[in-house]
Amino acid sequence: MADDAAVEDYPTEIEDNLNDFDSSLSSVQNMVQTLVSVSRSDRLLKLDPLEQAKLDLMSAYALNSMFWMYLVTQGVNPKDHPIKQELERIRTYMNKVKEITDRRKAAHIDKEAASRFVRNALWDADDKKRKDKTEHQQKGKHTKFTWS
């Protein structure tokens, strides 16, 4: 009954925000448990170097973000704390990894295939017929008939 009275004291917007925060916190807790359940070395063995970098950056960013939230709950302004520079540094590396990933996904041009494609696209059957006809006419003027 005391809980009902306490809940009624809060506006519904705050109650909704608290419920959202609680569900988000549970989700984060489940993700952290999933990450911690397998050893880091086992997890890294299954990944290529780029994926390893992504995992390390994601872990560092998540940990620093949680520390940011901790500072807020303690009344410390995180914008004046060195954690802000650390998050910016991690974000810079995340952008570098994203650029590398985008470059890998970018289309590569096969010059030989492109030249064949252009050559064949420009080829015209009528031109070929005209060329064959003129060659045949020129050969026809100088044809020798031999009797065997």
Curated annotation (Swiss-Prot):
Gene Ontology molecular function terms on file: DNA binding; RNA binding
Protein encoded by which gene: c1d
Subcellular compartments: Nucleus; Cytoplasm; Nucleus, Nucleolus
DNA-binding keyword on record: yes
Segments of this protein annotated with the region Disordered: 128-148
Entry keyword rRNA processing: yes
Name of this protein: Nuclear nucleic acid-binding protein C1D
Ranges annotated as biased composition (Basic residues): 139-148
Record keywords: Coiled coil, Cytoplasm, DNA-binding, Nucleus, RNA-binding, rRNA processing
Xref: PANTHER family: NUCLEAR NUCLEIC ACID-BINDING PROTEIN C1D, SUN-COR STEROID HORMONE RECEPTOR CO-REPRESSOR
InterPro entries noted in UniProt: Exosome-assoc_fac/DNA_repair (IPR011082), Sas10/Utp3/C1D (IPR007146)
Organism in which the protein naturally occurs: Danio rerio
A biological-process GO annotation: regulation of gene expression
GO cellular component terms given for this protein: cytoplasm; exosome (RNase complex); nucleolus
Coiled coil ranges: 83-107
